């Protein structure tokens, strides 16, 4: 596995947000992150990940902070570590037809549905709730702070 750059060592996401939710009774916490910009850059994709309460995988970072070889090296470890994960897509045609906001929502719903489990809480990277449904929490720079969002960010880019 490639060694992480020194600048990444201090920026490890953790399970603090997830632990708070688990302690409050939310057993299934899903982290989501999106990649892509629709018709001018291909499909829009949203990753969803459920991480275990009792095990960690080290070297997970916000995927934007990892080089492509680092992301590729982490992919199998992250995929095997997650209790569940999925990626949902909205095609460039759906992005054109629905608009980017609705296409992002569609891709998120597809990813969450593909998990095969009903989430108690969904953590979203960013400041906009593109999932909807009331059981969501938007976290600015969530991929740098929440381990489930960081896992989703790695899985969606593979």
Where is each model-derived feature located?
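RNase H-like, Mg2+-dependent phosphodiesterase core
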Residues: 1-158
């Amino acid at each position: 596995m490639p060694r992480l750059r020194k600048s990444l060592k201090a920026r490890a996401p953790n399970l603090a947000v997830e632990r708070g939710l688990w302690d409050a009774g939310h057993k299934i916490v899903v982290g989501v992150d999106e990649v892509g910009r629709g018709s001018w850059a291909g499909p829009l994709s949203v990753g969803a990940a459920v991480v275990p309460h009792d095990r960690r995988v080290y070297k997970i970072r916000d995927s934007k902070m990892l080089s492509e070889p680092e992301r590729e090296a982490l992919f199998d470890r992250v995929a095997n570590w997650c209790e569940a994960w999925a990626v949902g897509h909205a095609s460039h045609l759906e992005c054109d037809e629905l608009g980017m906001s609705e296409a992002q929502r569609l891709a998120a719903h597809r990813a969450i549905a593909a998990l095969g489990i009903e989430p108690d809480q969904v953590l979203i990277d960013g400041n906009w709730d593109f999932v909807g449904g009331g059981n969501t929490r938007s976290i600015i720079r969530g991929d740098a702070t929440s381990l489930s969002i960081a896992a989703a960010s790695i899985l969606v880019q593979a």
